[in-house]
Amino acid sequence: MEVMPQPLTIVILAAGLGTRMKSRHAKVLHQAGGKTLLQHVIDTALELAPAERIFVVVGHQAEKVRQSVTTPGIGFIEQTEQKGTGHAVLIGRHALAGLDGHLMVLYGDCPLLRTETLRRLIAQAAEGPAAGVLLSAMMDDPYGYGRVIRDSRGHVLDVVEQKSGTPEQLAIKEANMGIYCFRAGLFWEHVGEIEPNNPAGEYYLTDMPAILHRAGHTVEAMRIDDPAEALGINDRAQLAEVDRIFRDRKRRAVMAAGVTLIQPETITIDPAAEIGQDSIIESFAQILGKTKIGENCRVGSCSIVSDSTLADEVHIGAFTIVTTSVLEHGVHAGPYARLRMENHVEAGAHIGNFVELKKTRMGKGAKANHLAYLGDSEIGARVNIGAGTITCNYDGFKKHRTGIGEGAFVGSNSTLVAPIDIGEGAYVAAGSVITNPVPPDALALGRARQEIKEEWAKKRRKLAKT
């Protein structure tokens, strides 16, 4: 049975710029798997400790990093000079030293760490006498990683960095992953002994195992099977690889829950998205943000559904974009439709090809099957919107509302100049420009009367020849 130390304090190191990213943005602000690298690590930490026991060390672009964190209650410690990982923790001593229990150190650019792995690390730290436990992995090529030096009993004596190791030490395949869980009291007692004895003049947290060993304490290492789990991101290629891993994890979880993905490797599903059983997501679709999709739905190829809610049996045709909208049971949208923002489409309604909705409510069974723009509108149940209909909702200064009552029929190529209301059961003749309210059950015609001029074309052609 796992033993979880209580309480646990977590420090996340996120002060670096990440020069190899070749970016104007701090490294931890880059996104993989639908969230910033830092937010991934924070979300993992929240599975282990309350927000008030989680602290982020910030440095480069400190204010932007603070603002990027979506979790209330997280503490921040500013490292104005980046002098190494040991220094990053040491400057938080006044804020953290009074917190007993265990202290875990994580990195803001290591988003792939699983909660289960960290629980095992914490349990090992709690069960035994060790002053600290570090995470390690066996690697075929550990170049660039610190090597874990053990004694005959398997205890950690030291972590030797690539630049300072002897050939014998560098031949060791066990690499330090840089994740630690210390007994807080012993850590704060000895962390001040770290010295900048390296060409960079920095204070390295990797010195702590040797310091604790010299003080007569035991340090252990817990090996993980997959080194990629603790992969830190240093450049764009690694960022892309981590994003791929996140996407693959999510796709596998979705399929395990009963969702069919057609060509799954082409599909993007964000971590917070939810998809119901027996739904089908076609190739190259993107399910983004906090989208919730019900059961027996289908999302067509190359469609994008973002921060929206789809009830059961909703069908999204290919190349359709749905943003911050609600689609009730049995709605059909697309192909090539756009539900731009804040729309609510009631049960059984149809939004056809090349139809755009913006801040519009469509009633039950309403239909706009072809080539229409409906903005800032309230459309009643069973309304039929003909092809080419547009609501003229903007007068150059303000947006205006269009209301269409239940059972109304709007003919093709109609222009509805808002603000305007069309009553229940009313008809709008095709080609009309409607500028005044239409009473219920009335017929509105707003077009020029057709005129026929016999033989006009024949005379025009004859004239052109002269």
Curated annotation (Swiss-Prot):
<feature type="binding site">
    <location>
        <begin position="107"/>
        <end position="109"/>
    </location>
    <ligand>
        <name>UDP-N-acetyl-alpha-D-glucosamine</name>
    </ligand>
</feature>
<keyword id="KW-0479">Metal-binding</keyword>
<feature type="binding site">
    <location>
        <position position="340"/>
    </location>
    <ligand>
        <name>UDP-N-acetyl-alpha-D-glucosamine</name>
    </ligand>
</feature>
<dbReference type="GO" id="GO:0003977">
    <property type="term" value="F:UDP-N-acetylglucosamine diphosphorylase activity"/>
</dbReference>
<feature type="binding site">
    <location>
        <begin position="13"/>
        <end position="16"/>
    </location>
    <ligand>
        <name>UDP-N-acetyl-alpha-D-glucosamine</name>
    </ligand>
</feature>
<feature type="binding site">
    <location>
        <position position="109"/>
    </location>
    <ligand>
        <name>Mg(2+)</name>
    </ligand>
</feature>
<keyword id="KW-0963">Cytoplasm</keyword>
<dbReference type="Pfam" id="PF14602">
    <property type="entry name" value="Hexapep_2"/>
</dbReference>
<dbReference type="InterPro" id="IPR050065">
    <property type="entry name" value="GlmU-like"/>
</dbReference>
<keyword id="KW-0573">Peptidoglycan synthesis</keyword>
<feature type="binding site">
    <location>
        <position position="27"/>
    </location>
    <ligand>
        <name>UDP-N-acetyl-alpha-D-glucosamine</name>
    </ligand>
</feature>
<dbReference type="InterPro" id="IPR038009">
    <property type="entry name" value="GlmU_C_LbH"/>
</dbReference>
<dbReference type="Pfam" id="PF12804">
    <property type="entry name" value="NTP_transf_3"/>
</dbReference>
<feature type="binding site">
    <location>
        <position position="176"/>
    </location>
    <ligand>
        <name>UDP-N-acetyl-alpha-D-glucosamine</name>
    </ligand>
</feature>
<dbReference type="GO" id="GO:0009245">
    <property type="term" value="P:lipid A biosynthetic process"/>
</dbReference>
<feature type="binding site">
    <location>
        <begin position="84"/>
        <end position="85"/>
    </location>
    <ligand>
        <name>UDP-N-acetyl-alpha-D-glucosamine</name>
    </ligand>
</feature>
<comment type="pathway">
    <text>Nucleotide-sugar biosynthesis; UDP-N-acetyl-alpha-D-glucosamine biosynthesis; N-acetyl-alpha-D-glucosamine 1-phosphate from alpha-D-glucosamine 6-phosphate (route II): step 2/2.</text>
</comment>
<comment type="pathway">
    <text>Nucleotide-sugar biosynthesis; UDP-N-acetyl-alpha-D-glucosamine biosynthesis; UDP-N-acetyl-alpha-D-glucosamine from N-acetyl-alpha-D-glucosamine 1-phosphate: step 1/1.</text>
</comment>
<keyword id="KW-0511">Multifunctional enzyme</keyword>
<feature type="binding site">
    <location>
        <position position="161"/>
    </location>
    <ligand>
        <name>UDP-N-acetyl-alpha-D-glucosamine</name>
    </ligand>
</feature>
<feature type="binding site">
    <location>
        <position position="412"/>
    </location>
    <ligand>
        <name>acetyl-CoA</name>
    </ligand>
</feature>
<dbReference type="InterPro" id="IPR018357">
    <property type="entry name" value="Hexapep_transf_CS"/>
</dbReference>
<keyword id="KW-0961">Cell wall biogenesis/degradation</keyword>
<comment type="subunit">
    <text>Homotrimer.</text>
</comment>
<feature type="binding site">
    <location>
        <position position="146"/>
    </location>
    <ligand>
        <name>UDP-N-acetyl-alpha-D-glucosamine</name>
    </ligand>
</feature>
<feature type="binding site">
    <location>
        <begin position="393"/>
        <end position="394"/>
    </location>
    <ligand>
        <name>acetyl-CoA</name>
    </ligand>
</feature>
<dbReference type="InterPro" id="IPR025877">
    <property type="entry name" value="MobA-like_NTP_Trfase"/>
</dbReference>
<keyword id="KW-0133">Cell shape</keyword>
<dbReference type="GO" id="GO:0008360">
    <property type="term" value="P:regulation of cell shape"/>
</dbReference>
<keyword id="KW-0460">Magnesium</keyword>
<comment type="function">
    <text>Catalyzes the last two sequential reactions in the de novo biosynthetic pathway for UDP-N-acetylglucosamine (UDP-GlcNAc). The C-terminal domain catalyzes the transfer of acetyl group from acetyl coenzyme A to glucosamine-1-phosphate (GlcN-1-P) to produce N-acetylglucosamine-1-phosphate (GlcNAc-1-P), which is converted into UDP-GlcNAc by the transfer of uridine 5-monophosphate (from uridine 5-triphosphate), a reaction catalyzed by the N-terminal domain.</text>
</comment>
<feature type="region of interest" description="N-acetyltransferase">
    <location>
        <begin position="258"/>
        <end position="466"/>
    </location>
</feature>
<keyword id="KW-0808">Transferase</keyword>
<dbReference type="InterPro" id="IPR005882">
    <property type="entry name" value="Bifunctional_GlmU"/>
</dbReference>
<keyword id="KW-0677">Repeat</keyword>
<dbReference type="InterPro" id="IPR029044">
    <property type="entry name" value="Nucleotide-diphossugar_trans"/>
</dbReference>
<feature type="binding site">
    <location>
        <position position="387"/>
    </location>
    <ligand>
        <name>acetyl-CoA</name>
    </ligand>
</feature>
<feature type="region of interest" description="Pyrophosphorylase">
    <location>
        <begin position="1"/>
        <end position="236"/>
    </location>
</feature>
<dbReference type="GO" id="GO:0006048">
    <property type="term" value="P:UDP-N-acetylglucosamine biosynthetic process"/>
</dbReference>
<dbReference type="GO" id="GO:0000902">
    <property type="term" value="P:cell morphogenesis"/>
</dbReference>
<comment type="similarity">
    <text>In the C-terminal section; belongs to the transferase hexapeptide repeat family.</text>
</comment>
<dbReference type="GO" id="GO:0019134">
    <property type="term" value="F:glucosamine-1-phosphate N-acetyltransferase activity"/>
</dbReference>
